[in-house]
UniProtKB/Swiss-Prot annotation:
GO molecular function list: ATP binding; phosphoribosylaminoimidazolesuccinocarboxamide synthase activity
Keyword Phosphoprotein: no
PROSITE patterns xrefs: SAICAR_SYNTHETASE_1 (PS01057), SAICAR_SYNTHETASE_2 (PS01058)
Keywords of the record: ATP-binding, Ligase, Nucleotide-binding, Purine biosynthesis
Enzyme Commission number(s) of this protein: 6.3.2.6
Record-stated family: Belongs to the SAICAR synthetase family.
Gene assigned in the entry: purC
Pathway: Purine metabolism; IMP biosynthesis via de novo pathway; 5-amino-1-(5-phospho-D-ribosyl)imidazole-4-carboxamide from 5-amino-1-(5-phospho-D-ribosyl)imidazole-4-carboxylate: step 1/2
NCBIfam families reported in the protein's UniProt record: purC (TIGR00081)
GO BP term, pick one: cobalamin biosynthetic process
The protein's name in its UniProt record: Phosphoribosylaminoimidazole-succinocarboxamide synthase
Enzyme class: ligase
Amino acid sequence: MEKREKLYEGKAKIIYATDEPDKVIAYYKDSATAFDAIKKATIEGKGVLNNKIASFFFQLLNEKGIPTHFIKQISDREMLIYKVDIIPVEVVVRNIAAGSIVKRLGIPEKKEFDPPLVEFYLKNDELHDPIICEQHIYAMDLAKPEEVQKMKELALKVNDVLREFMREQGIILVDFKLEFGRKDGQIILADEISPDTCRFWDAKTGEKLDKDRFRFDLGDLIEGYTKILEKIQKKEGE
């Protein structure tokens, strides 16, 4: 597999072409951003941790029959993935109230949602990723109704798998953000699953082990992410 030119650079990753047109390489950067990149920093080692954590989660989901863009981890910072046409909609699944929903709706933090909530956000930095409904998605021709239903179905399946897996490691999956893409006419999971995109709380102590550590200066980010990686690697080694 030959790594070729840079195709795209985002806040957390760089995408490179390969000598196979349907495959690309995702390189995980050490950048940390919050609040629409108003707060940003370079944190050495963050990219390595996120690549390893995301690779583990994608492999787990692939094994559970959930289609993802992940092929394999190829280095500490890189994974080989399928090239997809990204749908510009972020799908958020919430098991427990935290973050923006608390501020937006006045819902008490830590309120449990049963069943989990599924929300859609327009993937647009200039507009600050506003929350949207299904009708907005159709009106803007972002996705077809059957695609939106598939995204919801897959998001809830991801929640079932990861919530139970993390519970077994003593970690609460509070909420998470997913992105999806089209490949050969099918909807598959894309982007990443990591402490950048999920909220993880220690079930015993309530300690936050995700990007909220950086957002709100709650503690060392690397320490929190390392705890997540150690938990899942310990399980993998059993």
